[in-house]
């Protein structure tokens, strides 16, 4: 890998280290969600049904419970903080190379979003040095993310292995059996870099930066350059039979024409498809 490419990739990773978004909860919702009867109930799965258990996470829950005097906030943290581990994390060793491999469901959909999975496990990175198993699981998420990027850097969500009759198989784009959905969203490539950088800065573990990672970085940079659209319309096209305009792309799936000024075009967003662009250096 060329020195310039490595520097570019590392610089990009550093620039993606933004503070996670904080979502506001409407006052009207808070009383409904945290009714007096609700805070007496443990909504976590029984221990035998939890997908992954971390000693460090359980100890953190106990520490925070001691700090929070508000009973409702304590209940919310106790049930929400471990939810990703309890219900969405599927950890194993890769059958081919024996490395940690973690597939993270995005809630009730049995598929892994690159952006979502990076955000879902983000709060646990701070505890990685306190729990070897947790650290290994996080490395597995990163390993899986970069493998998926190498399957298709334009895809936003992937199946846990090939599924010939996937839910969005009829979308008019370059689908394959491992892809759950192929909406080109620039944050799908930013979040894995952000997670890998933060994990490395926290743990010092460089095992994740292997040949798969180098290939993924090359694919990411190639994709970004392609979507600058300096010459032509780029490689990505997408159409879906739908009654929602946000779920498909105009101009026969190629999107609105843009002036080639160095911006990276991104056809998708977290709320659906559109023709927005993200500023980036030329």
Give the residues covered by each predicted segment.
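Solvent-exposed loop and edge beta-strand segments that line ligand/cofactor-binding
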Residues: 41-52, 102-117, 135-138, 147, ...
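Bacterial N-terminal signal peptides that target proteins for export
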Residues: 1-10
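Membrane helical hairpin/interfacial module
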Residues: 107-166, 170, 177-181, 203-214, ...
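Long, well-ordered core segments of solenoidal/helical folds
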Residues: 80-95, 137-156, 214-233, 265-268
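Low-complexity, Ser/Thr/Pro/Gly-enriched N-terminal "stalk/linker" regions
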Residues: 27-115
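N-terminal signal peptide c-region/cleavage motif recognized by signal peptidases
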Residues: 18-19
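The feature captures the catalytic groove of carbohydrate-active enzymes
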Residues: 107, 162-202, 208-209, 228-282
């Amino acid at each position: 890998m060329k020195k310039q490419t490595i520097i570019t990739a590392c610089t990009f990773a550093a620039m993606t280290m933004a503070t996670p978004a904080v979502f506001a909860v409407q006052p009207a919702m808070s009383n409904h969600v945290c009714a007096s009867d609700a805070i007496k109930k443990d909504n976590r799965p029984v221990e035998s049904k939890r997908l992954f258990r971390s000693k460090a996470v359980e100890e953190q829950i106990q520490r925070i419970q001691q700090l929070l005097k508000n009973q409702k906030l304590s209940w919310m943290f106790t049930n929400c903080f471990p939810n990703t581990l309890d219900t969405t994390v599927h950890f194993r060793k890769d059958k081919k190379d024996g490395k940690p491999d973690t597939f993270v469901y995005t809630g009730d959909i049995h598929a892994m979003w690159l952006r979502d999975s990076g955000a879902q496990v983000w709060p646990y990175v701070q505890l990685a040095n306190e729990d070897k198993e947790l650290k290994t699981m996080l490395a597995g998420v990163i390993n899986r993310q970069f493998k998926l990027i190498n399957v298709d850097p334009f895809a936003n969500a992937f199946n846990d292995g090939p599924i010939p009759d996937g839910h969005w198989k009829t979308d008019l784009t370059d689908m394959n059996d491992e892809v759950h959905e192929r909406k080109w969203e620039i944050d799908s490539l930013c979040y894995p870099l952000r997670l890998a950088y933060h994990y490395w800065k926290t743990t010092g573990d460089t095992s994740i930066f292997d040949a798969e990672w180098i290939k993924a970085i090359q694919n990411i940079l190639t994709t970004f350059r392609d979507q600058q659209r300096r010459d032509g319309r780029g490689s990505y096209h997408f159409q879906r039979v739908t009654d929602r305009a946000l779920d498909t792309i105009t101009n026969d799936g190629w999107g609105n024409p843009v002036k080639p000024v160095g911006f990276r075009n991104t056809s998708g967003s977290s709320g659906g498809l559109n023709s927005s662009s993200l500023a980036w250096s030329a």
